[in-house]
Protein backbone atom coordinates (compact mmCIF):
# COMPACT_ATOMS: atom_id res chain seq x y z
CA UNK A 1 0.00 0.00 0.00
CA UNK A 2 1.46 3.30 -1.07
CA UNK A 3 1.60 6.42 1.03
CA UNK A 4 -0.98 8.18 -1.08
CA UNK A 5 -3.53 5.41 -0.58
CA UNK A 6 -3.06 5.55 3.21
CA UNK A 7 -3.74 9.30 3.23
CA UNK A 8 -6.90 8.86 1.15
CA UNK A 9 -8.23 6.22 3.58
CA UNK A 10 -7.67 8.53 6.58
CA UNK A 11 -9.50 11.38 4.88
CA UNK A 12 -12.49 9.25 3.94
CA UNK A 13 -12.97 7.65 7.39
CA UNK A 14 -14.75 10.64 9.15
CA UNK A 15 -17.47 10.84 6.47
CA UNK A 16 -19.81 8.21 8.02
CA UNK A 17 -19.75 10.04 11.42
CA UNK A 18 -20.84 13.30 9.80
CA UNK A 19 -23.64 11.51 7.98
CA UNK A 20 -24.84 9.91 11.22
CA UNK A 21 -24.90 13.29 12.94
CA UNK A 22 -26.87 14.78 10.06
CA UNK A 23 -29.43 11.98 10.19
CA UNK A 24 -29.77 12.43 13.95
CA UNK A 25 -30.59 16.12 13.51
CA UNK A 26 -33.23 15.29 10.93
CA UNK A 27 -34.83 12.72 13.24
CA UNK A 28 -34.94 15.18 16.15
CA UNK A 29 -36.48 17.85 13.93
CA UNK A 30 -39.18 15.41 12.83
CA UNK A 31 -39.90 14.50 16.46
CA UNK A 32 -40.26 18.15 17.46
CA UNK A 33 -42.53 18.78 14.49
CA UNK A 34 -44.76 15.88 15.52
CA UNK A 35 -44.98 17.24 19.07
CA UNK A 36 -46.03 20.67 17.83
CA UNK A 37 -48.69 19.18 15.60
CA UNK A 38 -49.96 17.03 18.47
CA UNK A 39 -50.39 20.08 20.75
CA UNK A 40 -52.26 22.08 18.10
CA UNK A 41 -56.01 21.43 18.56
CA UNK A 42 -56.89 22.67 15.08
CA UNK A 43 -59.54 25.11 16.36
CA UNK A 44 -59.73 28.69 15.20
CA UNK A 45 -58.83 31.28 17.83
CA UNK A 46 -57.52 28.67 20.31
CA UNK A 47 -53.99 28.33 21.65
CA UNK A 48 -52.40 26.03 24.19
CA UNK A 49 -50.44 27.36 27.13
CA UNK A 50 -47.24 25.72 28.31
CA UNK A 51 -48.91 24.59 31.56
CA UNK A 52 -51.64 22.69 29.70
CA UNK A 53 -54.54 25.15 29.68
CA UNK A 54 -56.28 26.45 26.55
CA UNK A 55 -56.86 30.11 25.83
CA UNK A 56 -59.17 31.80 23.37
CA UNK A 57 -59.19 35.29 21.89
CA UNK A 58 -60.60 37.07 18.87
CA UNK A 59 -59.51 40.11 16.89
CA UNK A 60 -61.91 43.01 16.67
CA UNK A 61 -62.85 44.06 13.12
CA UNK A 62 -60.83 46.92 11.65
CA UNK A 63 -58.71 47.04 14.81
CA UNK A 64 -55.38 45.65 15.91
CA UNK A 65 -56.61 44.89 19.40
CA UNK A 66 -57.94 41.51 20.50
CA UNK A 67 -60.68 40.57 22.94
CA UNK A 68 -59.49 38.13 25.56
CA UNK A 69 -62.12 35.41 26.03
CA UNK A 70 -60.56 33.42 28.86
CA UNK A 71 -58.57 30.34 29.84
CA UNK A 72 -60.28 26.94 29.66
CA UNK A 73 -59.49 23.37 30.63
CA UNK A 74 -60.31 21.80 27.23
CA UNK A 75 -59.82 22.99 23.64
CA UNK A 76 -63.52 22.40 22.90
CA UNK A 77 -64.55 24.88 25.58
CA UNK A 78 -62.19 27.49 24.15
CA UNK A 79 -63.51 26.80 20.64
CA UNK A 80 -67.14 27.34 21.71
CA UNK A 81 -66.15 30.58 23.40
CA UNK A 82 -64.54 31.76 20.16
CA UNK A 83 -67.63 30.82 18.14
CA UNK A 84 -69.94 32.84 20.38
CA UNK A 85 -67.67 35.88 20.09
CA UNK A 86 -67.26 35.46 16.33
CA UNK A 87 -71.03 35.40 15.74
CA UNK A 88 -71.38 38.64 17.69
CA UNK A 89 -68.52 40.49 16.02
CA UNK A 90 -68.60 39.11 12.46
CA UNK A 91 -72.19 37.93 12.14
CA UNK A 92 -73.14 35.27 9.61
CA UNK A 93 -69.81 35.64 7.81
CA UNK A 94 -67.92 34.25 10.80
CA UNK A 95 -65.98 31.02 10.35
CA UNK A 96 -66.98 28.76 13.25
CA UNK A 97 -65.38 25.75 14.83
CA UNK A 98 -68.79 24.15 15.41
CA UNK A 99 -71.21 25.44 12.76
CA UNK A 100 -73.89 22.99 13.89
CA UNK A 101 -74.08 24.76 17.26
CA UNK A 102 -74.61 28.26 15.85
CA UNK A 103 -78.31 28.41 16.77
CA UNK A 104 -77.59 27.32 20.34
CA UNK A 105 -74.87 29.82 21.18
CA UNK A 106 -75.87 32.80 23.35
CA UNK A 107 -76.12 36.31 21.92
CA UNK A 108 -74.86 39.20 24.05
CA UNK A 109 -76.83 42.43 24.35
CA UNK A 110 -74.07 44.41 22.62
CA UNK A 111 -70.70 43.93 20.97
CA UNK A 112 -68.80 45.53 23.83
CA UNK A 113 -65.84 43.48 25.10
CA UNK A 114 -67.50 42.85 28.46
CA UNK A 115 -70.72 41.49 26.93
CA UNK A 116 -68.75 39.41 24.43
CA UNK A 117 -66.69 37.87 27.24
CA UNK A 118 -69.86 37.05 29.21
CA UNK A 119 -71.41 35.28 26.20
CA UNK A 120 -68.16 33.40 25.55
CA UNK A 121 -68.07 32.14 29.14
CA UNK A 122 -71.63 30.80 28.85
CA UNK A 123 -70.86 29.15 25.51
CA UNK A 124 -67.76 27.48 26.93
CA UNK A 125 -69.79 26.01 29.82
CA UNK A 126 -72.30 24.40 27.44
CA UNK A 127 -72.27 20.65 26.91
CA UNK A 128 -74.12 19.48 23.82
CA UNK A 129 -75.85 16.14 24.14
CA UNK A 130 -76.80 14.48 20.81
CA UNK A 131 -79.79 12.75 22.41
CA UNK A 132 -81.26 16.03 23.62
CA UNK A 133 -82.74 18.96 21.72
CA UNK A 134 -81.25 21.57 24.02
CA UNK A 135 -77.89 22.73 25.22
CA UNK A 136 -77.27 22.11 28.88
CA UNK A 137 -74.88 24.29 30.86
CA UNK A 138 -72.49 22.61 33.28
CA UNK A 139 -74.81 23.80 36.06
CA UNK A 140 -77.66 21.23 35.92
CA UNK A 141 -80.25 23.79 37.07
CA UNK A 142 -79.78 25.98 33.99
CA UNK A 143 -80.93 24.94 30.52
CA UNK A 144 -80.59 27.13 27.44
CA UNK A 145 -83.11 26.33 24.73
CA UNK A 146 -82.14 26.60 21.04
CA UNK A 147 -83.13 30.24 20.69
CA UNK A 148 -81.28 33.50 20.28
CA UNK A 149 -81.09 34.43 23.93
CA UNK A 150 -79.68 37.85 24.72
CA UNK A 151 -77.38 38.11 27.72
CA UNK A 152 -77.19 41.36 29.62
CA UNK A 153 -76.83 42.61 33.15
CA UNK A 154 -80.57 43.32 33.35
CA UNK A 155 -81.45 39.72 32.48
CA UNK A 156 -79.09 38.40 35.14
CA UNK A 157 -80.64 40.73 37.75
CA UNK A 158 -84.15 39.68 36.72
CA UNK A 159 -83.32 35.99 37.15
CA UNK A 160 -81.73 36.65 40.51
CA UNK A 161 -84.65 38.70 41.84
CA UNK A 162 -87.23 36.17 40.66
CA UNK A 163 -85.40 33.30 42.34
CA UNK A 164 -85.22 35.20 45.63
CA UNK A 165 -88.83 36.50 45.70
CA UNK A 166 -91.34 34.32 47.63
CA UNK A 167 -94.10 32.54 45.75
CA UNK A 168 -97.81 33.29 46.13
CA UNK A 169 -98.36 30.04 48.05
CA UNK A 170 -95.70 30.97 50.59
CA UNK A 171 -97.23 34.44 51.01
CA UNK A 172 -100.70 32.93 51.58
CA UNK A 173 -99.41 30.49 54.19
CA UNK A 174 -97.63 33.33 55.98
CA UNK A 175 -100.86 35.34 56.09
CA UNK A 176 -102.75 32.36 57.56
CA UNK A 177 -100.11 31.93 60.25
CA UNK A 178 -100.34 35.60 61.17
CA UNK A 179 -104.14 35.40 61.44
CA UNK A 180 -103.85 32.54 63.95
CA UNK A 181 -101.76 34.56 66.41
CA UNK A 182 -103.65 34.90 69.72
CA UNK A 183 -104.07 38.47 70.90
CA UNK A 184 -102.44 38.99 74.29
CA UNK A 185 -104.39 40.76 77.07
CA UNK A 186 -103.81 44.43 77.60
CA UNK A 187 -101.08 45.39 80.01
CA UNK A 188 -103.17 48.31 81.29
CA UNK A 189 -105.64 46.05 83.15
CA UNK A 190 -106.74 47.62 86.44
CA UNK A 191 -106.05 46.00 89.77
CA UNK A 192 -109.77 45.44 90.36
CA UNK A 193 -109.92 42.92 87.47
CA UNK A 194 -107.21 40.71 89.02
CA UNK A 195 -109.19 39.54 92.01
CA UNK A 196 -107.31 36.30 92.60
CA UNK A 197 -103.77 37.62 92.39
CA UNK A 198 -101.38 39.16 94.88
CA UNK A 199 -99.91 42.49 93.98
CA UNK A 200 -96.28 43.14 94.75
CA UNK A 201 -94.99 46.67 95.25
CA UNK A 202 -91.28 47.36 94.98
CA UNK A 203 -89.79 48.89 98.12
CA UNK A 204 -87.84 51.37 96.04
CA UNK A 205 -91.09 53.07 95.03
CA UNK A 206 -93.38 53.12 98.13
CA UNK A 207 -96.97 54.26 97.67
CA UNK A 208 -97.81 57.75 98.80
CA UNK A 209 -100.77 56.54 100.88
CA UNK A 210 -102.17 53.26 102.21
CA UNK A 211 -104.29 51.32 99.79
CA UNK A 212 -105.99 47.98 99.47
CA UNK A 213 -107.66 45.70 96.94
CA UNK A 214 -111.42 45.41 97.24
CA UNK A 215 -113.17 42.07 97.78
CA UNK A 216 -110.07 39.93 98.22
CA UNK A 217 -107.48 38.92 100.75
CA UNK A 218 -104.41 41.04 100.27
CA UNK A 219 -101.36 42.37 102.04
CA UNK A 220 -101.69 45.83 103.46
CA UNK A 221 -98.80 48.19 102.83
CA UNK A 222 -98.22 51.39 104.77
CA UNK A 223 -95.58 54.04 104.26
CA UNK A 224 -94.25 56.08 107.14
CA UNK A 225 -91.11 57.96 108.02
CA UNK A 226 -89.30 54.86 109.28
CA UNK A 227 -89.82 52.96 106.03
CA UNK A 228 -92.34 50.49 104.70
CA UNK A 229 -94.17 48.07 106.95
CA UNK A 230 -96.35 45.18 105.92
CA UNK A 231 -99.29 44.10 108.05
CA UNK A 232 -101.07 40.79 108.17
CA UNK A 233 -103.51 39.93 105.43
CA UNK A 234 -107.01 41.14 106.14
CA UNK A 235 -110.46 40.76 104.68
CA UNK A 236 -111.09 43.98 102.84
CA UNK A 237 -114.84 43.38 102.79
CA UNK A 238 -115.02 44.28 106.49
CA UNK A 239 -113.51 47.69 105.99
CA UNK A 240 -114.49 50.69 104.01
CA UNK A 241 -112.26 52.52 101.60
CA UNK A 242 -109.26 54.23 103.12
CA UNK A 243 -108.36 57.72 102.11
CA UNK A 244 -105.19 59.67 102.87
From Swiss-Prot:
Q: Where is the composition biased (Polar residues)?
A: 1-14
Q: What superkingdom heads the lineage?
A: Eukaryota
Signal peptide span: none
Q: Which Gene3D superfamilies match?
A: AP2/ERF domain
Q: Region entry Disordered: which residue ranges? A: 1-42, 154-177
Q: Which SUPFAM superfamilies match?
A: DNA-binding domain
- Alphabetical list of InterPro entries matching this protein: AP2/ERF_dom, AP2/ERF_dom_sf, AP2/ERF_TF_ERF_subfamily, DNA-bd_dom_sf
Q: Does the keyword Transmembrane apply?
A: no
| Principal location | nucleus
What GO molecular functions are on record for this protein? DNA binding; DNA-binding transcription factor activity
Composition bias, kind Basic and acidic residues: at what positions? 19-30
- Comp. bias intervals (Low complexity): 154-176
* Key words of the record: Activator, DNA-binding, Ethylene signaling pathway, Nucleus, Transcription, Transcription regulation
Sorted alphabetically, the Gene Ontology BP terms of this entry are:
ethylene-activated signaling pathway
Q: Where in the cell is it found?
A: Nucleus
Q: Which GO terms describe its cellular component?
A: nucleus
Q: Which sequence positions fall in the DNA-binding region?
A: 42-99
Q: What does this protein do?
A: Probably acts as a transcriptional activator. Binds to the GCC-box pathogenesis-related promoter element. May be involved in the regulation of gene expression by stress factors and by components of stress signal transduction pathways.
Q: Which family does it belong to?
A: Belongs to the AP2/ERF transcription factor family. ERF subfamily.
Q: What is this protein called?
A: Ethylene-responsive transcription factor ERF037
Amino acid sequence: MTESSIISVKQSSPVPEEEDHHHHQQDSHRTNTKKRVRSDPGYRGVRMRTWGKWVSEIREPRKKSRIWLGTFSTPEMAARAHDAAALTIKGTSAVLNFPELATYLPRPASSSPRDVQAAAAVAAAMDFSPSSSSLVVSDPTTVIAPAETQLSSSSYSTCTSSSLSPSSEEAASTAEELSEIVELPSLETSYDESLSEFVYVDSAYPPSSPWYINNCYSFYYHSDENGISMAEPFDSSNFGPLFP
